[in-house]
Amino acid sequence: MGSYLNPGSKGFQESLNSEIYVDKTGLIEKTNAVLNTRQKFICVSRPRRFGKSMAADMLAAYYDRGENSASLFSSLKIHYVSSYQQHLNQYDVIKVNMQEFLSMTHSMDEMLTMLQKYLVFDLTDHFQNVRFRDKNNLIQVMKDIYAKTNRSFVILIDEWDCLFREYQQNQDAQKKYLDFLRAWLKDKDYVALAYMTGILPIKKYGSHSALNMFTEYSMTCLLYTSPSPRDLSTS
């Protein structure tokens, strides 16, 4: 288990241990359905405090092949879905919170350098039996891993859009970031699922062409489904 590669289930376990927990594992059925398809790119845009990070923790706990997390899901809705066993703990997971890297750096170049350096550290430490062409190149490292192991990755990016608030007047920094995401994720066999969370829709940033592979789910009208009040009352 690394800091960013196969981070484990601790975050999701804390959600389950909380005084109030609402079962949102139905999301896993949706992500299972798009694994290794052209629809494997998902971006969820919601306001703060709407459970975006909890959902990312949940997906990490479910897919992470580094541990057996079956006991966490045994009483949740996803346990009774046909795809549950097929994908449980079957993927290497990369999970990053972009706000963390933004807070530790002072420029876009520095942020992207640190992000790639830290991910490469976890990857090369874990996959020690792989011969790497270039350990300074994240994309090539992941290509080499996939070529050797035929194991694809679930990539979870929390707060993907935080830099647009920090660099809202710096179009050059924004372009560098979008170009990096596109190069890292698009048309890569090593991606089984890419799941990003943010506050505002992708289109807010004028980035249709850069990230046009993503299907975006945003909240334009907040409503409860009919079972939700009942679920809340029994939580």
Segments the model singles out, each with a brief description of its role:
Residues M1-S226:
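Phosphate-binding site recognition
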